């Protein structure tokens, strides 16, 4: 890990050596109010600060400023107005304890004159954020004279890192916490358990880490797709393991305590996620009696009909709560298969006893019970939006990832929500042309798209719903991210867009933000982070940047094979609206098909036309199970009844290719009114995505 001083040494040495107007300063997130004043303040060597903080609050602050900024502080009852650097806390201890959930208690005022810097806030958290702004203002030991008043928009400004699919060391986690603090992010969602490996020491259940914290292959995809995939015992327990391709690790309880304290010193709350009842392959491997079948490798769900499952989860959660003081405990709740529950005698008995109509209600029953346990222990349940299926537990908070509607629905019903919709907030998706970028997981989310996302739609601004939207979070799933450099490349700078969304009420627009990102990215690189350089961005797929002019534009389309409703794009007008898709399948221009018919559509040209060329593009994205068709057939007809095949193409693309856009092209001359395009799938469960049928391109 880069030592703690790296931020002081690198972040404080931002690129410019002369003072620029404040509007050009690279402050991220943009402050609420900033006024330029005459002059500059010099950070002289040996500068010391004074503060009225005392006790543990003073100790934490002084340790941080000494280590990171090389500025020690003294604690005094009434900081002198003559002191060159003053931090003044005006609030109470009770307010300090409430600050993490209150935007007003996180605010600060920063006043810089040629002779003094004063930061005033009601809480230590607010003072800390004032220091981060001060650090971003400093250039070449000079700070421009300014007056800033600043308060965040949302109390929850988060980042999630998946540590199950690939394990990240304590130092690597701390490094990201440092950057989070610098950009005023305050929630770290720690995804600790999943099928890729269990990462937290649980003293009552040692087999979780002894048997499933390591696996026999570092490449998650290769390992996961094996029919006989194997976990590996802790290599420290093996007589001979050198040379074996063992990947993994886990955090001891001492590791976790250290990281929790490290985060707290930066005013970051860590929210642990313990997946249940799905995504539990590793649990039922170590303790197969907790599955419906009693056998490992037969399911990924816990048996929610067995009492011992609840005993196990409650015992695990007791140890979790001893380590993490967070209000919320995240229980996952997403993507449970529920397959074995349908035939499991224990699950069926519970369904009968509690009059549950389906397995979705059975999962809801499980979630309600876990929530009662957490509530009885003074905590609250947070889960992915699948916990809304069945009936939502009464006090649960929802993390909305499958779009925005689930979150808005939960908020309307009075539940607190964290917005993390995958199309905007999943940082493991491609951020530029997928054919030139490192391997990523589905989708395409460029910086501008992430920046433009607003957790509260315009229609709901100023309504009572706003108070239930706690904030926004970026998420990094690491199935295809093995190395720290790759992890950081995916996180930065898109996380900076979410930092600004979470903090700044009146944003200045993407063009201004992009300029600030360039400076911030350079600073990140000097500090040892492998950030994506937005100056090298290729941008949107060229074909998507303008309307395609062709004779089929606006013509009616008959669907003999229906598109999937969740990938409907613009419905029946999609394939002749002149709009080609971007690099990603989620942005509303690509239409998805998965039924047995595949793509089978007829374009009515309105009259018999000389058809000279027909084009269509098909996406191939391996990890999203979107494949180029097995066959593409072009047919024509004058009457719409009798069709003649004029072309049949077998693309011959290897399904092992990560990403490509296959261009189907036909040229010739045929008179017809109806143009029919058919495309069959390579595999029964594979998707076909296409965006436009271009006829007689102009």
Question: Language-model features: where?
Answer:
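Aromatic, loop-rich ligand-recognition surfaces of beta-strand-rich domains
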Residues: 197, 583-650, 658-698
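Feature activates predominantly on carbohydrate-active enzymes
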Residues: 26, 101-301, 305-310, 316-328, ...
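Active-site neighborhood of glycoside hydrolase catalytic domains
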Residues: 283, 289-293, 297-394, 401-408
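Flexible loop/turn segments at secondary-structure boundaries
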Residues: 167-169, 195-201, 277-283, 330, ...
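Predominantly extracellular/luminal regions of secreted and cell-surface proteins
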Residues: 546-582
């Amino acid at each position: 890990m880069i030592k703690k001083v790296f931020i002081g040494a690198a972040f404080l040495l931002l690129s410019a050596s002369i003072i620029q107007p404040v509007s050009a300063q690279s402050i991220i997130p943009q402050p609420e109010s900033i006024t330029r004043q005459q002059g500059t303040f010099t950070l002289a060597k040996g500068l010391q600060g004074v503060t009225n903080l005392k006790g543990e609050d003073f100790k934490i602050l002084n340790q941080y400023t000494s280590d990171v900024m090389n500025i020690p502080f003294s604690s005094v009852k009434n900081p002198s107005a003559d002191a060159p650097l003053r931090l003044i806390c005006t609030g109470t201890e009770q307010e300090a304890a409430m600050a993490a959930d209150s935007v007003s208690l996180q605010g600060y005022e920063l006043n810089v004159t040629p002779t003094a810097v004063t930061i005033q806030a009601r809480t230590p958290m607010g003072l800390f954020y004032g220091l981060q702004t001060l650090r971003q203002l400093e250039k070449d030991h000079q700070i421009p004279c300014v007056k800033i008043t600043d308060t965040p928009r949302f109390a929850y400004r988060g980042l999630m890192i998946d540590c199950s699919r690939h394990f990240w060391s304590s130092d690597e986690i701390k490094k990201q916490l440092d950057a989070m603090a610098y950009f005023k992010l305050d929630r770290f969602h720690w995804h600790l358990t999943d099928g890729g490996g269990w990462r937290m020491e649980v003293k009552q259940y040692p087999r979780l880490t002894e048997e499933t914290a390591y696996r026999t292959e570092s490449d998650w995809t290769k390992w996961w797709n094996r029919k006989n995939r194997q976990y590996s015992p802790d290599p420290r327990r093996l007589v001979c393991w050198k040379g074996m391709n063992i990947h993994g690790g886990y955090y001891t309880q001492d590791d976790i305590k250290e990281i929790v304290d490290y985060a707290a010193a930066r005013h970051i709350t860590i929210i642990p996620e313990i997946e249940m009842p799905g995504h539990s392959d590793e649990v039922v491997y170590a303790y197969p009696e907790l599955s419906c079948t009693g056998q490992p490798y037969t399911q990924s769900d816990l048996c929610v009909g067995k009492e011992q499952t609840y005993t196990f989860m409650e015992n695990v959660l007791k140890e979790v709560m001893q380590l993490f003081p967070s209000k919320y405990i995240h229980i996952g709740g997403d993507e449970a298969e529920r397959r074995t529950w349908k035939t499991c005698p224990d699950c069926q008995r519970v369904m009968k006893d509690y009059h549950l109509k389906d397995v979705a209600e059975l999962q809801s029953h499980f979630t309600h019970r876990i929530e009662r346990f957490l509530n009885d222990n003074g905590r609250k349940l947070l889960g992915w939006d699948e916990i809304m299926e069945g009936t939502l537990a009464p006090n649960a908070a929802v993390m909305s990832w499958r779009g925005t509607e689930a979150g808005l629905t939960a908020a309307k019903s009075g539940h607190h929500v964290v917005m993390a919709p995958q199309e905007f907030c999943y940082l493991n998706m491609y951020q530029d042309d997928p054919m030139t970028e490192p391997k990523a997981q589905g989708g395409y989310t460029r910086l501008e798209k992430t920046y433009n996302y607003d957790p509260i739609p315009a229609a709901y601004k100023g309504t009572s719903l706003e108070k239930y939207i706690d904030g926004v979070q970026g998420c990094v799933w690491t199935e295809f991210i093995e190395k720290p450099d790759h992890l950081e490349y995916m996180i930065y700078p898109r996380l900076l867009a979410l930092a600004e969304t979470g903090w700044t009420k009146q944003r200045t627009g993407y063009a201004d933000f992009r300029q600030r990102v360039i400076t911030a990215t350079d600073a990140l690189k000097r500090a040892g982070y492998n950030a994506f350089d937005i100056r090298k961005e290729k941008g949107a797929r060229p074909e998507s940047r303008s309307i395609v002019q062709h004779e089929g534009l606006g013509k009616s389309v008959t669907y003999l094979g229906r598109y999937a409703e969740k990938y409907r794009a613009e419905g029946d007008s999609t394939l002749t609206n002149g709009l080609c898709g971007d690099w990603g399948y989620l942005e509303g221009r690509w239409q998805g098909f998965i039924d047995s018919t595949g793509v089978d559509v007829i374009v009515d040209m309105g009259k018999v036309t000389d058809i000279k060329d027909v084009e269509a593009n098909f996406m191939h994205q391996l990890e999203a199970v979107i494949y180029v068709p097995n066959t593409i057939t072009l047919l024509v007809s004058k009457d719409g009844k009798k069709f003649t095949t004029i072309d049949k193409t077998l693309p011959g693309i290897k399904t092992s290719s990560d990403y490509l856009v296959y261009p189907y092209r036909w040229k010739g001359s045929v008179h017809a009114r109806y143009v029919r395009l058919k495309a069959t799938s390579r595999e029964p469960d594979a998707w076909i995505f296409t965006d436009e049928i271009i006829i007689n391109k102009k």
